[in-house]
Swiss-Prot record:
Function in brief: NDH-1 shuttles electrons from NAD(P)H, via FMN and iron-sulfur (Fe-S) centers, to quinones in the respiratory chain. The immediate electron acceptor for the enzyme in this species is believed to be plastoquinone. Couples the redox reaction to proton translocation (for every two electrons transferred, four hydrogen ions are translocated across the cytoplasmic membrane), and thus conserves the redox energy in a proton gradient.
A Pfam family the protein falls into: Proton_antipo_M
GO cellular component terms attached to this protein's record: plasma membrane
UniProt-annotated location(s): Cell membrane
Enzyme Commission number(s) of this protein: 7.1.1.-
Family: Belongs to the complex I subunit 5 family.
InterPro entries associated with the record: NADH_UbQ_OxRdtase_chlpt_su5_C, NADHpl_OxRdtase_5_subgr, ND/Mrp_TM, NU5C-like, Proton_antipo_N
Protein name (database record): NAD(P)H-quinone oxidoreductase chain 5
Gene3D superfamilies according to UniProt: 1.20.5.2700
Biological processes per GO annotation: ATP synthesis coupled electron transport; electron transport coupled proton transport
Taxonomic lineage: Bacteria, Bacillati, Cyanobacteriota, Cyanophyceae, Synechococcales
Keyword Iron-sulfur: no
Major enzyme class: translocase
Alphabetical keyword list: Cell membrane, Membrane, NAD, NADP, Plastoquinone, Quinone, Translocase, Transmembrane, Transmembrane helix
Length: 681
């Protein structure tokens, strides 16, 4: 087994090798590489499959009690400065390796069906493999410098994949927005890393925590400075995990192809922020103000994401705001000291949210056969309905994911979310109440999505409904790449003339198999965290923490907390059923009764508008003023210098006439002038 640990560096290198080989092929032999599309896909999937096998073996060995393993080499040295690079395999990294490789493998299989007709099929696989390599490198990083390197690489891959369809303006704008927003958090992270090194002289997670605590307790370092440095580091996870106020990029990231929405923006990259908080736990935990900041940031983000998701009509954006909300739960858990609970929810959420996103892609794939390849129409739930009849596998898997995220037992989300709420009640009842209310909203908007998409009658052939959607957005149809028939771009003509069917269809096996595979952990994996026999907590717990099991499990307390969680979820489900399935209440009446709240949710709390006015328009105004200064002052000074040189040159050229007696006269005049001046003084 020691050989496996010594070769663990291959886990991130294998997908990197796949991406490199295919990438070189695309650059050097583009046409030939694209013709061998499925061979390239199988090659990349095989590389990742090998990484999954190695990751699974490492996780199993860690479960059996193998000690943590670290392999380091000295990368840079100058005097007392030593920087080491390498990898570490411990309980947390082994778990994350399996999560990343398993979800990535299923997403790559799914991609073969979803991107089958896209001309960028091979390029997409190369990007996916590069991302998988970067994410795997991140989770085995032993220090902050290496984390930061891979942190930026996953950000770059996110940029490439969000803007994959770069000829669509919305996608090009979205990848820039994601990149710029994440740079704000990453700048804070970089400052925090440098500040912590200045204070402690180390980049190692555990060493930083020990030394920082010692410096603060001895009075050498101010507690306020330590808190500021820790909060600067936390800015990185705030951006990467889409926490308030840097959450605005994630919904726009849905402009990328759906497989990357599942892999990057639901299961792995956005969870990297929570992972970094876990790694930095020895630094954060001793500083109460930092822990409170983390807890309340997560709590407010969970509430914010849920309130916006209530009114979303785009199926992917609804899931995006749901992701923001669930990430808020994880961050809140880390802030209240519920280390194990936060990471448990990270694991369960990775599987059921990846499945939900892939289900949404399956729905979009089916809808495109009816409404065409305009993402506005193909993704809007108002023209779906009744899809359970046509897409039973997708509908069943989406229902499983919905029950899991709503916290209905025995599905995975119940055990992880209920544990967070129970510990939040012990830490701060206010945090519990907000989380509890958010759980009710989660149940409402998720079943709203399910009922609007899969129940009732199919509305995809209703031209009036489609026109209403286009009118709502105030946009003309915007057909994206991937249309299989040029005639499909003619939106106004009838469907029969364009090869469109009048009914959606179930997706191929390459797309439905990953859904069914992800449904298994979405149902069963939560049982690892049963509170009376919490195997997950026994395996994953905070550094230095000793897990103590109570002699007797408090069933009464469990029934009260679980009953509250299930009760609020059932209320949310019931309200959604009455509105969107049984149609006992008209949601429009409620929107008209509370127009301010409805508009607040529909307009995403106006954060995009506020940021546009403050930062986008504000920076443009500043840029225009700087341009005026540059034009009038800087350019004026430069031009004036040139003018003075020109005029003086024009004047002086007449002195250079080539006559010696004229030069002698000038010399005589100059000498005479000096004599007169000195005689007077």
């Amino acid at each position: 087994m020691e050989l496996l640990y010594q070769l663990a560096w291959l886990i991130p290198v294998l997908p990197l090798f796949g991406a490199t080989v295919v990438g070189i092929g695309l650059i050097s032999f583009n046409q030939a590489t694209n013709k061998l599309r499925q061979i390239n896909a199988v090659f990349i999937i095989s590389c990742l499959g090998a990484a999954l096998v190695m990751s699974g073996a490492l996780l199993w060995d860690q479960i059996q009690g193998h000690a943590s393993y670290a392999q380091m080499i000295e990368w840079a040295s100058a005097g007392s400065f030593h920087l080491e690079m390498g990898y570490v395999i411990d309980h947390l990294s082994a778990l994350m390796l399996v999560i990343v490789t398993s979800v990535a493998l299923l997403v790559m299989i799914y991609t073969d069906g979803y991107m089958a007709h896209d001309p960028g099929y091979v390029r997409f696989y190369a990007y996916l493999s590069l991302f998988a390599s970067s994410m795997l490198g991140l989770v085995i990083s032993p220090n902050l410098v290496q984390v930061y390197i891979f942190w930026e690489l996953v950000g770059m891959c996110s940029y490439l994949l969000i803007g994959f369809w770069y000829d669509r303006k919305a996608a090009a704008d979205a990848c820039q927005k994601a990149f710029v927003t994440n740079r704000v958090g990453d700048f804070g992270l970089l400052l925090g890393i440098l500040g912590l090194y200045w204070a402690t002289g180390s980049f190692d997670f555990g060493t930083i925590g020990e030394r920082l605590e010692g410096l603060v307790s001895s009075g050498v370092l101010s507690g306020a400075i330590a808190a500021i440095l820790a909060i600067l580091v936390f800015l990185g996870p705030v951006a990467k995990s889409a926490q308030f106020p840097l959450h605005v990029w994630l919904p726009d990231a849905m402009e990328g192809p759906t497989p990357i929405s599942a892999l990057i923006h639901a299961a792995t990259m956005v969870a990297a922020g929570v992972f970094l908080v876990a790694r930095m736990y020895p630094v954060f935990e001793p500083i109460p103000v930092v822990m409170n900041t983390i807890a309340f940031t997560g709590c407010f983000t969970a509430f914010l994401g849920a309130t916006i998701a209530l009114t979303q009509n785009d199926i992917k954006k609804g899931l995006a705001y749901s992701t923001i909300s669930q990430l808020g739960y994880m961050v809140m858990a880390m802030g209240i000291g519920a280390y194990s609970a936060g990471l448990f929810h990270l694991m369960t959420h990775a599987y059921f949210k990846a499945m939900l996103f892939l289900c949404s892609g399956s729905v979009i794939h089916g809808m495109e056969g009816v409404v065409g390849h305009d993402p506005i129409l193909a993704q809007d739930m108002r023209i779906m309905g009744g899809l359970r009849k046509y897409m039973p596998i997708t509908a069943t898997c989406f229902l499983i994911g919905t029950l899991a995220i709503c916290g209905i037992p025995p599905f995975a989300g119940f055990w992880s979310k209920d544990e967070i709420l129970g510990l939040a009640f012990q830490a701060n009842p206010l945090l519990w109440f907000v989380g509890w209310a958010t759980a009710g909203m989660t149940a409402f908007y998720m079943f709203r999505m399910y009922f609007m998409t899969f129940e009732g009658g199919f509305r995809g052939n209703d031209q009036e409904a489609k026109d209403g959607v286009l009118q709502f957005y105030g946009l003309l149809p915007n057909f994206g790449p991937g249309a299989m028939n040029v005639k499909e771009l003619d939106h106004e003509a009838g469907h029969d003339d364009h090869g469109h069917s009048s009914e959606p269809h179930e997706s191929p096996l390459t797309m439905t198999f990953p859904l069914m595979a992800l449904a298994v952990p979405s149902v069963l994996i939560g049982l690892l965290g049963r509170p009376w026999a919490n195997q997950f907590e026994a395996f994953i717990h905070a550094p230095g923490e000793v897990v103590e099991h109570a002699a007797e499990f408090e069933w009464g307390e469990f029934y009260v907390m679980a009953g509250n969680s299930i009760g609020i979820a059932l209320i949310g489900i019931t309200v959604a059923s009455l509105m969107y399935w049984q149609h006992k209440f008209d949601p429009k009446v409620l929107a008209e009764k509370f127009p301010s709240l409805y508009q607040l949710s529909l307009n995403k709390w106006y954060f995009d508008d506020l940021y546009d006015k403050l930062f986008v328009q504000g920076s443009r105004r500043v840029a225009r003023q700087i341009m005026e200064v540059d034009y009038k002052v800087i350019d004026g000074a430069v031009n004036l210098t040139g003018l003075v040189t020109l005029v003086s040159g024009e004047g002086l050229k007449y002195l250079e006439n080539g006559r010696a007696q004229f030069y002698a006269l000038i010399v005589f005049g100059a000498v005479l002038g000096f004599v007169i001046v000195f005689s007077l003084t």
